[in-house]
Amino acid sequence: MLTGKQKRFLRSKAHHLTPIFQVGKGGVNDNMIKQIAEALEARELIKVSVLQNCEEDKNDVAEALVKGSRSQLVQTIGNTIVLYKESKENKQIELP
């Protein structure tokens, strides 16, 4: 579980990132969760954009992504979700 200080630190790191995944009309599926889990292992911190044509609520999408990829939700702002998962092999971010 992330503390408030750690979330603030990760939000500042994520500010300059661009979303690398988009959740659209199809919603969240197993293939997308697998790809997000692989991206989290490589990058540790990613942004996911929820498109307007997505039929699911953005909070439900965030919850599904967190459960499926076993990551932690840093922030949901607008239609953008920020996820963090500590990498096992190539750790880049040192939390305060």
Curated annotation (Swiss-Prot):
This is Probable RNA-binding protein YqeI. InterPro entries: RNA-binding_CRM, RNA-binding_domain, RNA-binding_YhbY, YhbY-like_sf. GO terms for molecular function: RNA binding. Residues 1-96 form the CRM domain. Keywords: RNA-binding. Gene3D superfamilies: YhbY-like (3.30.110.60). NCBIfam families: RNA_bind_YhbY. SUPFAM superfamilies: YhbY-like. The keyword Zinc does not apply. Transmembrane segments: none annotated. It comes from Bacillus subtilis (strain 168). The keyword Plastid does not apply.
